[in-house]
Amino acid sequence: MEDYGLPLVPEAIRRISDSADRKLAWQFFLMFSRFEYALKRQKYVRADRKDAQAAWKSFANDHAVKFSANHDPQLQRAIAYIKQAPPKKQIHENRVLDWAEPKHFSGGPLLPWLLDQVQIIRNNLFHGGKFPQFAVSDPSRDRELIESALVVLGHALRLNHDIEHRFLEGIDL
């Protein structure tokens, strides 16, 4: 990891940024952030907020019927993994960090539940939720969740041509 002239980048941060999973995390970051950009550009913006936040639930509800894993084994595996081992959500009570029990799929449209899980995976990764007091006991679980989330995002993107177009705009292919 380059230090870009920054004072004293801690060794722990250097180890994380130089890990084998760096590329996977970077791909997830790019995919998630471009998807949010595309949602907002296509007017999927939460009306209940002044700050521009992507309306993931609206998108998921609008496209839930079209979403299907029937003919894609990779998507089937990703969904099965997230259903089997959904991410925990970091919570706090009286300023003490803890983990909520995962929200398991209980029926109904699958896409809204899956995109909720993808957002939890993103929050855990990018807000440091996986390291509140100690390192994660099974990093491979995080890797599988991130890989599964990437597969779900890729398939969700193809549900709406306009969103897919916005996702790709300005990116030299």
Locate predicted features.
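Hydrophobic packing residues in well-ordered alpha-helices of helical domains and bundles
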Residues: 28, 115-118, 139-142, 146
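Amphipathic, Lys/Arg-enriched alpha-helical patches that create a basic surface
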Residues: 141-171
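Charged/polar positions within long, soluble alpha-helices
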Residues: 37-40, 44, 123-131, 154-165
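Short helix/strand-bridging catalytic loops that position acidic/His residues to coordinate divalent metals
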Residues: 14-20, 134-143
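Histidine-centered, metal-coordinating catalytic motifs and their short helical/loop contexts
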Residues: 111-134
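Amphipathic alpha-helical interface elements
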Residues: 1-117, 166-173
